[in-house]
Amino acid sequence: MSAQKLYASHVPLAPLSRMLLGIGSAVTAISDPKRGDMVAAMGETTAIGPVLENIRKRMESDVVGKRLLLEKPRISNGTIDRKWLRQLPDGTLGKLYSNFLDRLNTSPDARPTVKYIDNLEHLYVMQRYRETHDFTHIALEQKTNMLGEVTVKYFEGIQYGLPMCVTGGIFGGARLLTKNRQELVDRNLPWVVEQATNARFFMAFDWENHFEKQLSEVQKELNITPLSVNM
């Protein structure tokens, strides 16, 4: 077990407890993806130190990523002015993010707080991943239906190497209807592999400083070619 509680929400776990929680949360999350608490627990308990450290190092090697690690900005109701976002022009990242949240009737604070990470630097990496997941959907122009989620999970799995993302892509893909599974294999997967490989590292991007830009401009900065362009 960790020697001490490192932050307010921290729940130190003994190795056996971590393993059991990881297995249990994985089984539940795979069978019922709507269980956000189990998806979050699975993500944290399976995010082994070397994977998070690799993400941290990649962020540190990027000018913007290094600043993010230093300043540790958060994306929450307290830091995002949603009223201002709603007033932004159509097509901007901020307006699309606002529409995304409104459509799902959710908020930035709906993301579970990290609890099971035993390293303060890795804590921020995991929290940042969680808080920027919605921007990945927007940048890739992927819906929050099963096909869209699986496509995003494959992107994140390739870019970040997080076991939860890899597992979510594989098992989520297996749960798709035959038609959607074929669409994933024939169209989305080849595209998302190319995008994840060639795009800028999403974890080292300061999304909150680009709200007033058109999505097409943000995609250009990220080196993302929308799937619709290839159709």
Swiss-Prot record:
GO cellular component, one term: mitochondrion
Keyword Cytoplasm tagged: no
Keyword Metal-binding belongs to the record: yes
Cofactor(s) essential for the protein: Zn(2+)
Keywords associated with the record: Lyase, Membrane, Metal-binding, Mitochondrion, Mitochondrion inner membrane, Ubiquinone biosynthesis, Zinc
Domain of life: Eukaryota
Lipid bilayer topology: Peripheral membrane protein
UniProt xrefs under InterPro entries: Coq4, Coq4_euk
GO biological process, one term: ubiquinone biosynthetic process
Gene ablation phenotype (knockout): Extends the life span.
Binding site for Zn(2+): 133-134, 137, 149
Similarity field: Belongs to the COQ4 family.
Name used for this protein in its record: Ubiquinone biosynthesis protein coq-4, mitochondrial
Gene: coq-4
